[in-house]
A protein has these predicted regions:
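Short amphipathic alpha-helix used as the core "switch/output" element in two-component signaling
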Residues: 48, 72-85
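Alpha4 helix (beta4-alpha4-beta5 surface) of REC/receiver domains from two-component response regulators
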Residues: 15-19, 72-73, 96-113, 117, ...
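Conserved acidic carboxylate
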Residues: 8
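The feature encodes the CheY-like receiver
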Residues: 67, 85, 97
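His-Asp phosphorelay/catalytic-motif detector in bacterial-type signaling
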Residues: 1, 26-27, 55-59, 83-88
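Acidic, metal-coordinating helix/loop segments flanking the phosphotransfer/catalytic sites
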Residues: 16-18, 22, 31-59, 123
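Active-site residues of response regulator receiver
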Residues: 63, 93
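Conserved alpha-helical interface elements of two-component signaling phosphotransfer modules
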Residues: 11-15, 82
Length: 140
């Protein structure tokens, strides 16, 4: 089963995220998806993912600036569906815009993290978030 779903279109940020998770033994089963439409298909077991069992990821790390369907819409659909509402979603984005933060929380995001520009701090932020959501947090 997928533990972490990483929805990120930037290959460098995705690699840094996975490296930070791996170095903290949190990356046993990470699935990386590069656009919002594919992320929704994955979560809701549609299209190319229709054969997936309905085992939901334990954590979704979601960028906001995504091709095809943006992160806000992905968040809206996940949090408005009874089957997926309880999945912890952490926005991990370069956007520190107030409207993105407010809208994300209005839609039910569990955490909103702005990507640090410094590589070392980026890795630290991801590792701490992964540690909290995968090991410390108790989800239903």
């Amino acid at each position: 089963s997928v533990e972490i779903l990483l929805v990120e279109d930037n290959p460098t940020d995705a690699e840094l995220t996975m490296r930070a998770l791996r170095s903290n033994n949190l990356a046993n089963n990470v699935t990386w998806i590069k656009n919002g439409a594919e992320a929704l298909d994955f979560v809701f077991c549609r299209g190319a993912y229709s054969s997936r069992k309905n085992d939901h990821p334990k954590l979704i790390l979601l960028d906001l600036k995504l091709p095809k369907v943006n992160g806000i819409e992905v968040l809206r659909q996940i949090k408005s569906d009874e089957r997926t509402r309880a999945i912890p979603v952490v926005v991990l984005t370069s956007s520190a815009e107030e409207r993105d933060i407010v809208e994300s929380y209005r839609l039910g995001v569990n955490s909103y993290l702005v990507k640090p520009v410094d590589f070392e701090h980026f890795g630290e932020t991801v590792a701490k978030a992964g540690f909290y959501w995968m090991l410390m947090n108790k989800a239903p």
